[in-house]
Design a protein with these regions (language model features):
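Conserved structural motif at the start of ABC-family nucleotide-binding domains
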Residues: 4, 18-20, 74
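Helix-to-loop junction immediately C-terminal to a conserved catalytic motif
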Residues: 49
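Catalytic Walker B motif of ABC-type/P-loop ATPase nucleotide-binding domains
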Residues: 150-154
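Conserved ABC transporter NBD signature motif
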Residues: 57-68, 73
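ABC-family P-loop ATPase nucleotide-binding domains
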Residues: 81-137
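The feature captures the beta-strand-to-loop junction immediately N-terminal to the Walker
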Residues: 34-36
Length: 234
């Protein structure tokens, strides 16, 4: 079942256009949106989150138009970004208090468990944390209100490999029940080999290829023929 689907999604700027974005994210799967910087990954996710107003097309969550979702339905979707989205004066504990106020389905037990699992210091201010610790705080927060869909915008791309691997294990556990899903954007192809079930390539605002991970090797030559410059691989 498609938990998320876009139909002819568009976002038009003077110097850049996102056009005809038709993507599907299935329950129980991790889908990667991949492209070089400036390809349209963040614009796509901005439209999904509502931060950017789409110019056209539809976004469906569990078959329902995103524009008509109730607040409760919207709380089933969690977003995490490459920069922490809370005031840097907040402590890690205060991030959790904010979540408990904002979300009726906030799971304090899960939050505390994730803090322990990810070795996050509850009483430290965000401004005192490393980039990796901030990313782990953002993701722990996103997972603690029991979303059905987690959308990550380059959240792991600038982290060191050890932290990335730790988070990849967490993401795989998240979708194990077959009812939840993850869409994440990245320009690092090694992440795909570890966890992605499906990879969608975007280039200059267009989707150029959508493949199962098992098909990646045989299709790789086609991707290189469609783009001007390579994606980073570690």
């Amino acid at each position: 079942m498609n938990i998320l689907e876009t139909k002819n999604l568009e976002k038009v700027y003077d110097a850049f256009s996102l056009r005809d974005i038709n993507l599907e994210v299935k329950s129980g799967e991790i889908t990667a949106l991949v492209g070089e910087n400036g390809a349209g990954k963040s614009t796509t996710i901005g439209c999904l989150s509502g931060i950017k107003k789409k110019s056209g097309g539809k976004i469906l969550f569990k078959g329902k138009d995103m524009d008509s979702l109730s607040r409760e339905e919207r709380s089933e979707i969690a977003f995490a970004y490459d920069e922490i989205s809370f005031p840097l004066e907040f402590t890690v504990s205060q991030v959790g208090k904010y979540g408990s106020i904002l979300y009726a389905n906030w799971d304090e037990g899960k939050w505390l468990n994730l803090l322990t699992k990810l070795s996050l210091p509850k009483d430290r201010k965000l401004k005192e944390l490393s980039k990796g610790m901030k990313a782990k705080t953002e993701i722990a927060y996103s997972l603690s209100h029991d979303p059905s869909l987690l959308i990550l915008d380059e959240t792991t791309s600038s982290l060191d490999p050890v932290v990335r691997d730790e988070l990849m294990d967490l993401f795989q556990s998240f979708v194990e029940d077959g009812e939840k899903a993850i869409l994440f954007s990245s320009h690092i192809t090694s992440d795909l080999e570890k966890i992605a079930d499906r990879i969608i390539f975007i280039h200059k605002g267009r989707l150029i290829l959508s493949i199962d991970r098992n098909e990646l090797d045989e299709k790789w030559a086609l991707v290189h023929a469609e783009k001007d410059s390579g994606w980073e691989k570690e």
